[in-house]
Swiss-Prot record:
One of its GO terms (biological process) is ribosomal small subunit biogenesis. GO terms for cellular component: cytoplasm. It is found in: Cytoplasm. It comes from Pseudomonas entomophila (strain L48). Residues 116-275 form the CP-type G domain. Keywords: Cytoplasm, GTP-binding, Hydrolase, Metal-binding, Nucleotide-binding, Ribosome biogenesis, RNA-binding, rRNA-binding, Zinc. Monomer. Associates with 30S ribosomal subunit, binds 16S rRNA. SUPFAM superfamilies: P-loop containing nucleoside triphosphate hydrolases (SSF52540). Its cofactor is Zn(2+). This is Small ribosomal subunit biogenesis GTPase RsgA. One of several proteins that assist in the late maturation steps of the functional core of the 30S ribosomal subunit. Helps release RbfA from mature subunits. May play a role in the assembly of ribosomal proteins into the subunit. Circularly permuted GTPase that catalyzes slow GTP hydrolysis, GTPase activity is stimulated by the 30S ribosomal subunit.
Length: 343
């Protein structure tokens, strides 16, 4: 069934109602904050944001007698937007409720544009981004490459994870193996696992230990199943593939941070079908394709668009087999999706 198109007046009315609701929620939140800060608050202490629920977050105490305990906290209005993985300074109040008073500097942040083109942080202080895909739904190199560019741009090390390896068969193996070979040749770490059968899961756990990781990938690739296998007590709800579309149904509703027994953390984020890169420039995209780095700057023309220009180093590398057609197609698709002012 086709999605109903809204006219300008309907969109305006929806935004007006949402704005009024947000204003009422903010007013209620401010009243709660005033009551909390007017009472007895404990000393400032360090905390870790492990989940975000709109105007409130769950914070795990990092020091003191309450270390390891989780508190629901309100945010002061002057704070920037917080995300799972943020390190904060907070003060405990009554009845297990606290107030966040400061945000600690982030070592990294993973961002994506929202529907209005504004940057929205997804997770903070991550040092490993696990890009999950599977034989079904059919993996798209373009989406994988978008994640890789985002990881390179954010300075976060990527790990390519093929889940549902038990679904590889004679029909899909040739295409899948050809796609994987491209990434192996580029030197990207790649692991094949099956959360359902347990194959490769021990190796995955070893690769995650000691890192703050985030799982990304389109819906239906088994991110929640992976979390349930790695952390049986997490209780992440699992969704099936939609029979009609073959795409996954979104199950995780908020990003949450989990601890591994041997050290390291995992942030399980909602399924993302299309990872936008509107916040990066053409230069950022070119730098995100690691095999392009030694070639960029060697073209005959400084403003080369790597399309049909004579003396293009990228086109020559493509012709010689140094750059794969798969990656070149992804690059062109990503560049075409950028706003014109990013050129």
């Amino acid at each position: 069934m086709a999605k109903r198109q809204l006219n300008r007046r309907q969109n305006w009315r929806i935004e007006k109602i949402q704005g009024e609701r947000a204003a009422r929620a903010a007013k209620r939140e401010q009243h709660v904050l005033q009551e909390l800060e007017g009472g007895d608050l404990g000393p400032e202490q360090l905390g870790l944001v492990i989940a975000h629920f709109g105007v409130q977050v769950e914070v795990e105490a990092q020091d003191g007698e309450a270390a390891g305990q989780v508190f629901r906290c309100h945010l002061r209005a002057n704070l920037p937007a917080l995300v799972t993985g943020d390190r904060v300074v907070w003060r405990a109040g009554n009845q297990g409720i606290g107030v966040i008073v400061a945000q600690m500097p982030r070592s990294t942040e993973l961002c994506r544009p929202n529907n209005h083109g504004q940057l929205k942080p997804v997770a903070a202080n991550v040092d490993l981004i696990v890009i999950v895909f599977a034989p079904a739904p059919e993996p798209h190199p373009n989406l994988i490459d978008r994640y890789l560019v985002a990881a390179e741009h954010a300075g976060i090390r990527p790990l390519l994870l093929l889940n549902k390896a038990d679904l590889i068969n004679e029909e899909n193996a040739p295409t899948l193996n050809a796609m994987l070979e491209v990434y192996r040749n580029l030197g990207y770490p790649l692991l094949e696992v099956s959360a359902h059968q347990g194959d490769g899961m021990q190796r995955l756990q070893q690769m995650l230990d000691g890192h703050i990781s985030v799982f990304v990938g389109q819906s239906g690739v088994g991110k929640s199943s992976l979390v349930n296998s790695l952390l049986p007590d997490a209780g992440t709800r699992v969704g099936d593939l939609s029979e009609w579309s073959g795409q996954g149904t979104h199950t995780t509703t908020t990003a949450r941070l989990y601890h591994f027994p041997n050290g390291g953390d995992l942030i399980d984020s909602p399924g993302i079908r299309e990872f936008g890169l509107g916040h990066v420039s053409r230069d950022d995209v070119e730098d995100g394709f690691i095999e392009f780095r030694e070639l960029i700057g060697n073209c005959r023309f400084r403003d080369c668009k790597h399309d049909r220009e004579p003396g293009c180093a990228l086109l020559k590398a493509l012709e010689d087999g140094q750059v794969s057609q798969q990656r070149m197609s992804s690059y062109r698709s990503i560049i075409a999706s950028l706003p014109e002012d990013s050129y």
